[in-house]
Amino acid sequence: MKPVYVVELIEDVVAKVSTALLPQLQVIDPAITAVHYQHGHPKEIIETLMQKDKSETYQFRKYPLIALFQDFPEAHNLQIGIDNEATLHLVIVNSTRPDYKAGERYVKNFKPILYPIYLEFLKQISLSGKFLNYGIHTLGHTKIDRLYWGREGLYGSEGNVFNDWLDCMEIRDLKLKINLINC
């Protein structure tokens, strides 16, 4: 039995999301070059994005981004046909402006960019064959729309989590059963 790398399975899904949505996203923002992907510890992801800021080539090729946060558990419960069940924590982020109000964020970021990426991400997971599921509506998870994504405090966000101004869809506890037959 060969090892299954969840981070690579998600990378493949994000590549398909990018292929499916890029023309639609470029109508909204011609500067979008892809739906980008990173995985790792949140601090590492932030450092990588900061390094891109120093590059003329990559400083504007960061968003939209799907980031898979590590570490995540993989339960190996010896179910026939299942390699493991991974419980994932991801974010889908896009750059924004700090002066936008909630309504503007939905009109300019959430509805045209973040929600289509979110829905296509779930669709591509469902279609991939790498995960045991029965359609998009059986992928249990918690989704949080984070307008001006910052650290949580008593009165909401108290600063940027990343160094950029971002709107975010946070996906917590996405449970994916890795289909051993197709991996």
Kindly give the residue locations of the regions a language model identified.
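Low-complexity, acidic Ser/Thr/Pro/Gly-rich terminal tails and inter-domain linkers that flank the onset
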Residues: E47-F72
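Charged, amphipathic alpha-helical segments and their flanking helix caps
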Residues: M1-P42, R61, D71-C183
